[in-house]
Amino acid sequence: MKYSLKTVMSLVDHSGLKPYLREDEIARLIGEASEMGNYSVCIEPIYGNFAVEYIKEKGYSLKVDVTLDFPFGSLPTSARKKIIEDSVYADEIDMVIPIGYVKSHRWDKVEQDINDVVSTARDLGLVSKIITEDGYLTLDEKLKTYDIVIRSAPDFIKTSTGFADKEFCKSLGNETGATPENVKLMSEIAKKIGSNIGIKAAGGIHTYDQVEKIIDSAGMIPEPSNIRLGMSGTKKLYEEMKKASVQQS
């Protein structure tokens, strides 16, 4: 199915997550997101309050999305809950699963942690997205992790951070970043459970062809409450789609 420039851009969390980004670069990111009609800016929490104030000052209609325990998912649950509580200025949070527990198959601890962080976010009125970091998981681990995350009822399940170790992913026969196959698997498990959870695809999304396949794989109406696209290369895609639109008219 073909999707319009406006539709695609409305699904994007325009991301600036490199640790060396300066405040002026975050300001530029926010300006780009507003100009392109994106849903939110996805940034590190160090710039969270700045982003909220800058968006308010400029009068932009953008949400602020911050990444927490990112990209490693290595903090204890108590610390993860605390950083959620410290993020009440934001609209949304993207938090990584406790990867070590998943790889250790400590499913009891994974379930307890995810339930705790999701309920903490919900109590504070924050939209929550749980990042599964698909490239680090075997198929069996994906099936179990997706099931646990979806049953914990965050607003979204998210594919990846975009910062996964490529060599480790390769050792498991996995790609890094978002793939239509993993998005489809998430959607199928959600339907089996009876969940209307949203899906966020992130990591390595650069072209319209990728976007179209991902949205089709999700099998949902392409609205921001159902599907998100985490992208740092949004501007390139915007220009690509804009040019194609002009050529077709």
From Swiss-Prot:
GO cellular component: cytoplasm
Lineage, highest ranks first: Archaea, Methanobacteriati, Thermoplasmatota, Thermoplasmata, Thermoplasmatales
GO molecular function: deoxyribose-phosphate aldolase activity
Assigned EC number: 4.1.2.4
Disulfide bonding pattern of the chain: none
Name used for this protein in its record: Deoxyribose-phosphate aldolase
Job of this protein: Catalyzes a reversible aldol reaction between acetaldehyde and D-glyceraldehyde 3-phosphate to generate 2-deoxy-D-ribose 5-phosphate.
Record's keyword annotation contains Lyase: yes
Key words of the record: Cytoplasm, Lyase, Schiff base
Record gene name: deoC
